[in-house]
Amino acid sequence: MKLDITVIILTYNEELHIRRCLENVCPIARKVYVIDSPSTDNTVEICSEFSNVEVVVHKYPGNQAEQFNWALDNVKIETEWVLRLDADEYLLPELVEELYS
């Protein structure tokens, strides 16, 4: 069962990290948005392998707070909760268990 969570991940050339992050959050999140800045590596191609991931390319405005706020204002969020992750982060099993409880 997926949680009522939308995950927003900001990326720029994160091909070394993004797969692990997505493999971790895609099974539990209803929707995952990757806001790409735009990458010149295989970040976007890796993201396209996941069915509940939508990549939105947006030029990096200069800091992550602005990029995240842009995402909140411009992507369709239909869940009760939003979780922001970096591409090199993942959820520990204990946190996932807590989210389900």
List each language-model region with its residue ranges.
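Short beta-strand-to-loop acidic/aromatic patch adjacent to the donor-nucleotide binding site
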Residues: 71, 79-90
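Cell-envelope/extracellular polymer assembly enzymes that use nucleotide-activated donors
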Residues: 4-6, 31
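Short, well-formed alpha-helical segments that are part of the catalytic scaffolds
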Residues: 9-28
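Acidic donor-binding/catalytic loop of UDP-sugar-dependent glycosyltransferases
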Residues: 42, 87-100
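Conserved donor nucleotide-binding strand/loop of the catalytic core
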Residues: 45-74
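A conserved acidic beta->alpha catalytic loop
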Residues: 24, 36-45, 60, 86
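Acidic helix N-cap motif at the loop->helix transition within catalytic regions
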Residues: 19, 41-49, 94
